[in-house]
Amino acid sequence: MFGMSIRKFIILSALIVSGCISHPETIDIDFDSGTEDYTPLVRKILAEHPAGEVTIRFGAGTFDFYPEQAAGSYLCVSNNDNGYKRCAFLLEEMRRVRIEGAGEKTQLRFHGAIVPFRVARCEQIVFEAFTIDYDASFIFEGLVVGNDPRTHSITLRPLDPERFEIRSGEPWFTGYDWASPFGENILFDPGTRSPYYQAEQYEHDQKKTLQAEWIGDSLVRLSGYSSRELPPVGSVYTDKGPHSTNRRYPGFSFYKSAGVEVRNVTLHDSGGMALIAENCRNVVCSQYRVEVPPQSGRMVSASADATHFVGCSGKIVLRACRFESMLDDATNIHGVYMTVVDRLSGNRFGASFGHFQQEGFDFAEQGDSLVFIDRADLGVLGCGRVEEVNHVNENYYIIRTGFDLSAIPD
């Protein structure tokens, strides 16, 4: 009898506990031809759910997002370009948030200088069943229809001539609210949709200024082309702008978050990494695709890596994904080094990054363990637990650890 009472109590307790588990609220957003910008609506929904616990479910249709009313934040994103960003979906310190669509029938289209998704210090975040694109690519593309070794010039037919401009005689390409001079460039073979073999022989030296002129309504001549070989007729010239300014708008930016999943999502364009995760734990990409839109005529999807993971832990899962036509790696998984530049005391030192696109990275925090190595041979010099970190600026941190550096020679 007593045992039966205990069993009843356990069953009753389980029922009571399960009944207390809350379920995230679901908010459906249907396409409305009268809504030009869905950014304010999404910002309002997220503001009304500061802790998360919400599912935002988009129906079929193309949903547009503009930067004017997007939430802003200064972002230091590793291997991308730091700066103040407008973010269409800005999730901070939230848990159990889902952004869903109706599969291929749902397109989220972003306009101009805007980061689609920023997730910071969150848990259990899911993106599922939609397509991401921009109104205008962050890449200039033009078919080479002529070249002249005598004048060091090439003639292009721009894929989007309305986005090409000539400013002070030099070539620029534009978007909704941005404009870029020409810079880093690479040549594609339209037959194979891959870069030309030994493509560097066709790359224009960015230190040399190109001059541009219209030839009729649809052709552009670029003069002063400086390369070992001129791009052959029939190739596709692509340009993503100057180094240090062409990785400003990653598609997905995840920071210090856990349990983030991207499922059945297609990304057609991004002005930086398609997906970057920093100091995250357990990130899963399943049926995540980075590719150009069908029948678009484009050679390039994302302007950098399809996926990139920095300082992450737990599991990184890439399952049944497809990455093509981006201008960098399919995936890149690594940590970060800092250089000791000042010895302030035995266990206190100043440190800087070795690459400008890692500046501002959250390198370490109290309780982490650091390994000190000799940069000449990567030999381990010692280990120490972090006691304090002071971010003086993006490229100078003062760090105190339990390891005494005074015995280590310069």
Model-predicted regions and their roles:
Residues S13-S22:
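Hydrophobic h-region of N-terminal signal peptides that target proteins for export
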Residues C20, S194-R247, V380-C383, V389-D410:
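Small/polar beta-strand repeat architecture
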Residues I27-R57:
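Acidic Gly/Asp/Thr-rich repetitive segments characteristic of extracellular carbohydrate-active
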Residues L46-A47, D64-R98, R109-E128, D135-H152, ...:
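Extracellular beta-strand-rich solenoid/capping regions of secreted or surface-exposed proteins
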Residues F58, R98-G101, I125-A129, T238-D239, ...:
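All-beta strand scaffolds that present successive hydrophobic residues in beta-strands
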Residues Q69-L91, V115-R118, R247-F252, A274-I276, ...:
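Glycine- and acidic/polar-rich repeat regions and solenoidal domains
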Residues Y134-D135, E141, V145, L159-I215, ...:
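Ser/Thr/Gly-rich low-complexity blocks that favor extended beta-strand/coil architectures
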